Amino acid sequence: MLPDKIYAVYFSGTGTTKKTVTRIARRLADGLGAAYEEYDYTLPDARQRALTIPAGALAVVGCPTYAGRVPNLLMPYLRGMVRGGGALALPVVLFGNRNYDDALMELSQLLTAGGFTCIGGGAFVGEHSFSRTLGAGRPNGADEAEMDAFADGLAAKLRAGDTAAVTVGGCDPIRPYYTPRDRHGNPINILKVKPKTDMS
């Protein structure tokens, strides 16, 4: 049975995760003739409300990668407030042109523990939140074409009746957060570096 509704669920401090998740979710909704709804959990108030996606729906759930993992700020919300109720999920992570490390696996595990069946997963490059130079202009047109192909492939899988869970890459158990290092291999404390967040 095809999903009757596609949810775009995202945390997007700089807009690139929103752009990616909504593009994939809209493409799926259009391709499957399903309803579409967005849930933005970027601002703290949105993370005070539980989100339950009903059986028969599919949620494209996205977040950025921070230090190779799901941001620790989001863990309590994703662990305790997002529930699948038997719904399908597609975890999506954005990374700032270095690597997504274990973030996709971690998000997939969180969603599975919350009652979702993860039928795919995707990692896409986005402009880095701390630097407009790293991954500048990403996602770009070529990235969007990959997103469309990804969504089309998933729609074809669903049309074929395949809703089997998949295992995505990463290290299990999940590794510690990545520690940046200088050119001599010494750890660098980047806690003073703060991203600019678009609050509009």
Label each residue range with its predicted role.
Residues 197-200:
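Iron-sulfur cluster-binding cysteine motifs and their immediate structural context
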Residues 1-19, 23-43, 49-192:
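FMN-binding flavodoxin-like domain, especially the glycine-rich phosphate-binding loop
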